[in-house]
C-alpha cells in the first residue's frame, strides 16, 4: 500500500508526465512501437541519435538498478531508474506477494494488495533490454529481468519483453568488415579467412576437415595441451602419463564416481589411490581421488573428451588448394603445421564490450535495425529436464538474487567445475 501511494503521489506531483530523459517515438499505436532500456547515459545518447524516431523510444538507465529481490516495494518505487521504467511503460506494477496469491471465490488474487498492473495500458509492445556485452552489462540485465519477473510478469508471459544482442567483435580483412555476435561467430570468421584453402586429412581416412572444422580441431588440441601443462604445474602430475591413462581407459570419471558412490568427497577419501602406473623413466606414478577431483584434473578430462577422436585418428596430412603440402603430422605438431600453410593476410578483430564504443550508425546497423538485428524473447518456463538445478524461474531468482547465502553457495559449489569462461 505504501508503494502504491508513493507512485500515486509522484504521478500527481509530476502531472502524470513521462520521464524527462525518455526520448519517445512518434507512433502512438503500441503494437507498432518499441522502447529500448539502454545501459548508460552515453550509449543512450548514441541510441537516441541512431534510432528510427517513428517507432523507437529510448530510455537511458544510469548505473545498476536496485535488486528488487532484496528490497521492500516502497524502496523499489523510490528508486529513480525503476520509477522511470514504470512511468514510461504506463502499466504501473503488481505486488510480488499479490501475484503469487491464490484467487478467492470472487477471482480476486490480491485482497489488500490489489495489483494495479494494467497490461492494456502498455505503451510499447516491444520492451527491449539493451546492455553492454561485459560482466557489468550481464549484471544490469539480470537486475532488470528480476524487476520484470517480480513486478511486471505479464509482460514476460505476453511475449513483450526482449533482450538486444549487440555484437561482441568486428572483424576486418582489408576493406571487408563483418560484425560478429558470439565467440563461435568470431572463430568461424577467423577460420574462413585463414583456413578456407586448407584441408586436413587423417591417415586412416576418418577425418576430413576444412574451414571451421580445422579451427575447431586446433582449438580442442590447444585446450588439451594447455590443460596437460596445468596438471604438471598445479598438481605435479605428468601430463603425458595422465593422457595415457585417459587413452587406455584406465583413468576416467567412472573410476572417480565408483569410489565416491554418490557421496561427497571427504578428507579420508582424498588420499585414496585410484590409479597407479609408471612414468617413461620407470618411476612409480600414483593418482589420488583428491587429485582427480580438482578443477584442473576435471578440465583436463573434459578437454580430452573433446579431442579424443583427433588423438585416435592421426597422423595427419595437409592439402592446400587441393595439392598435398605436408604429411605424417602428429597431433602436437598439427597447430604449427597449419600455421605454416594458412593464409597470412592481416586480420583485425576489435572487441566491443560497451555500447558506447559504437557510434550511432553502428548501433543502428548492428543492434536496432529490425532488418538486421537479433532479439531474444524472454520467457519463463519450468525446467524440462529432471536434472536441471532450478525447477522453476521463481526458484532461480530466489536463490541467485535473494538474501539467503547458503543456497547460492551450494549452487556455486555444484557448478564451479563446469565453468568454461570466467570473466572477473
Each model region followed by its residue ranges:
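Conserved phosphate-chemistry cores used by DNA topoisomerases
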Residues: 1-424
Amino acid at each position: 500500500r505504501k508503494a502504491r501511494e508513493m507512485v500515486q503521489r509522484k504521478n500527481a506531483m509530476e502531472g502524470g508526465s513521462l520521464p524527462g530523459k525518455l526520448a519517445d517515438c512518434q507512433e502512438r499505436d503500441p503494437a507498432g512501437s518499441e522502447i529500448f532500456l539502454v545501459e548508460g547515459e552515453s550509449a543512450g545518447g548514441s541510441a537516441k541519435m541512431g534510432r528510427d524516431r517513428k517507432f523507437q523510444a529510448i530510455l537511458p538507465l544510469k548505473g545498476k538498478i536496485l535488486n528488487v529481490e532484496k528490497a521492500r516495494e516502497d524502496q523499489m518505487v523510490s528508486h529513480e531508474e525503476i520509477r522511470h521504467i514504470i512511468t514510461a511503460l504506463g502499466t504501473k506494477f503488481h505486488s510480488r506477494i499479490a501475484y503469487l496469491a491464490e484467487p478467492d471465490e470472487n477471482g480476486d488474487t490480491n485482497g489488500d494488495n490489489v495489483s494495479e498492473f494494467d497490461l492494456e495500458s502498455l505503451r510499447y509492445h516491444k520492451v527491449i533490454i539493451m546492455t553492454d556485452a561485459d560482466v557489468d552489462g550481464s549484471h544490469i540485465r539480470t537486475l532488470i529481468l528480476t524487476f520484470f519477473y517480480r513486478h511486471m510478469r505479464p509482460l514476460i508471459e505476453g511475449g513483450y519483453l526482449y533482450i538486444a544482442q549487440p555484437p561482441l567483435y568486428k572483424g576486418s580483412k582489408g576493406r571487408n568488415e563483418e560484425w560478429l555476435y558470439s565467440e563461435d561467430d568470431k572463430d568461424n570468421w577467423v577460420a574462413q579467412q585463414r583456413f578456407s584453402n586448407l584441408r586436413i586429412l587423417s591417415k586412416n581416412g576418418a577425418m576430413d576437415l576444412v574451414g571451421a572444422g580445422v579451427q575447431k580441431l586446433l582449438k580442442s588440441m590447444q585446450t588439451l595441451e594447455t590443460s596437460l601443462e596445468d596438471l604438471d604445474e598445479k598438481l605435479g602430475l605428468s601430463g603425458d602419463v595422465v593422457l595415457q591413462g585417459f587413452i587406455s581407459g584406465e583413468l576416467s570419471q567412472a573410476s572417480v564416481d565408483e569410489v565416491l558412490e554418490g557421496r561427497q568427497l571427504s578428507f579420508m577419501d582424498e588420499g585414496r589411490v585410484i590409479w597407479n602406473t609408471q612414468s617413461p623413466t620407470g618411476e612409480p606414478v600414483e593418482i589420488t581421488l583428491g587429485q582427480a577431483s580438482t578443477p584442473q584434473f576435471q578440465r583436463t578430462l573434459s578437454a580430452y573428451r573433446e579431442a579424443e577422436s583427433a588423438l585416435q585418428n592421426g597422423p595427419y596430412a595437409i592439402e592446400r588448394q587441393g595439392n598435398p603440402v605436408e604429411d605424417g603430422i602428429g597431433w602436437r605438431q598439427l597447430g604449427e603445421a597449419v600455421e605454416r600453410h594458412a593464409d597470412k593476410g592481416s586480420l583485425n578483430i576489435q572487441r566491443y564490450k560497451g555500447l558506447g564504443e559504437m557510434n550511432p550508425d553502428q548501433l543502428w546497423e548492428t543492434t536496432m535495425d529490425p532488418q538486421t538485428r537479433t532479439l531474444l524473447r524472454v520467457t519463463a518456463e519450468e525446467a524440462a529436464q529432471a536434472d536441471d538445478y532450478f525447477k522453476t524461474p521463481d526458484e532461480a531468482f530466489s536463490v541467485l538474487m535473494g538474501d539467503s547465502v547458503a543456497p547460492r553457495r551450494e549452487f556455486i559449489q555444484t557448478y564451479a567445475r563446469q565453468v568454461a569462461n570466467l570473466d572477473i
